UniProtKB/Swiss-Prot annotation:
Pathway of action: tRNA modification; tRNA-queuosine biosynthesis
Matching Pfam families: TGT
Class of enzymatic activity (EC top level): transferase
Homology family: Belongs to the queuine tRNA-ribosyltransferase family.
Signal peptide: none
Protein name per Swiss-Prot or TrEMBL: Queuine tRNA-ribosyltransferase
Record bears the keyword tRNA processing: yes
């Protein structure tokens, strides 16, 4: 039911191209996955996502538990029916949101107690509860409940969080009942390479369908994040998909792909769109800038998305300045397409045994051009 097939490995890096088979379709890796927090990728329909090349998307356990509630989703036939998406879906366990968003939380070995930001209700979330919610939601891939330590955090605090994550993984495995869902473990360990290694080595014997690297991109310097990913990814089974959570910029994905990572997710394409920004060839363009007001070129002439085929930079700039809702949809279409196309290009380069050259070219390109003050590196 779930199988990862490695099609090609890079001779010079750890990069690999593969196929991840799920009950709702196959995901060609490396692949960027759009984030649909509340069972929708903001401003986009399933048809938009398909046209952008999306194969698997995410939904958020924490937020869906709070609203509308997993019982309502289950009564609709699960997430696929509820949101009208026929492809694979991944749900996170809610751990990251509990630890990063919730106030007045209390953490113990049993789980987490926190106050709902919607109505102030006290909510308890345990490993067993996280699995039960995800089974009701019905995604293809579900994530183990973990404790995500903040950055910075003391070594002692990270040790405790890592040990608790391992204990909670065991409970998630015992609690899981549905055979049509793949449970992924999440490797923690903060910025400490030895703790990452210990956590990964403790998780691998469970022989789960996939493994994720969590607790990165939480405020640590990019250099440290890349080092942690480079250390952790090779420790994970070669015949299972590797998922880097919450990462989705060009440079981050490029280096993670070179380290052997297969799957990525991030809210950045739609979040930037809602702020009037486009991602173009790895750079961030603020379309409120005056230089776009009379620029009648496509946003990116090389991009095949609906936005780039149909509208000019000047028109998009006008929509952004006027705060027209259409701007957010059109920019989201392009930004999601841009990140998916980038991972598709990396995959093709791996298959054609030219990834090392591809990576070197993009490494050189992904530098802020001093002559382009409106461009920011992504």
């Amino acid at each position: 039911m779930f199988e990862f097939v490695c099609q090609q490995e890079c001779a010079h890096t750890q990069a690999r191209a593969g196929l991840f088979h799920t009950p709702h379709g196959t995901v060609a890796t490396p692949r960027f996955m759009p984030v649909g927090t509340l069972a929708n990728v903001k401003t986009l329909t399933p048809e938009h996502l398909k046209a952008a090349g999306a194969q698997m998307i995410l939904a958020n356990t924490y937020h869906l538990h709070l609203q509308p509630g997993e019982d309502i989703v289950a009564a609709a036939g699960g997430l696929h029916c509820f949101m009208g998406w026929s492809g694979p879906i991944l749900t996170d366990s809610g751990g990251f949101q509990v630890f990063s968003l919730s106030e007045m939380r209390q953490i113990s070995d049993q789980g987490v107690v926190f106050r709902s930001p919607h109505d102030g209700q006290i909510i308890e979330l345990s490993p067993e509860g996280a699995i039960a919610i995800q089974e009701a939601l019905g995604a293809d891939v579900i994530m183990a409940f973990d404790e995500c330590p903040p950055y910075p955090a003391s070594r002692e605090a990270v040790i405790q969080a890592t040990q608790r994550t391992l204990q909670w993984l065991e409970r998630c495995i015992v609690a899981k009942q549905r055979s049509d869902q793949a449970l992924f473990a999440i490797v923690q360990g903060g910025v400490y390479a030895d703790l990452r290694r210990e956590c990964a080595e403790a998780m691998v014997p469970y022989d789960l369908p996939g493994y994720a690297i969590g607790g990165v991109s939480v405020g640590e310097p990019n250099r440290i994040m890349h080092e942690i990913v480079a250390v952790t990814a090779p420790l994970l089974p070669v015949h299972k998909p590797r998922y880097l959570m919450g990462v989705g910029t060009h440079l981050e994905m490029l280096r993670a792909i070179a380290a052997g990572v297969d799957l990525f997710d991030c809210v950045i394409p739609t979040r930037l769109a809602r702020h009037g920004c486009a991602i173009v060839q790895g750079q961030r363009w603020n379309l409120k800038n005056a230089r776009f007001r009379r620029d009648y070129e496509p946003l990116d002439p090389t991009c095949p998305c609906y936005t780039c085929r149909t509208f000019s930079r000047a028109y998009l700039s006008h929509l952004v300045r006027a705060k027209e809702l259409l701007a957010y949809t059109l920019l989201s279409i392009h930004n999601v397409t841009e990140l998916i196309r980038f991972t598709q290009a990396a995959r093709q380069a791996i298959l054609e045994e030219r990834f090392a050259a591809f990576a070197a070219e993009w490494e050189q390109r992904l530098v802020v051009d001093a002559e382009e003050p409106d461009a920011a590196l992504l």
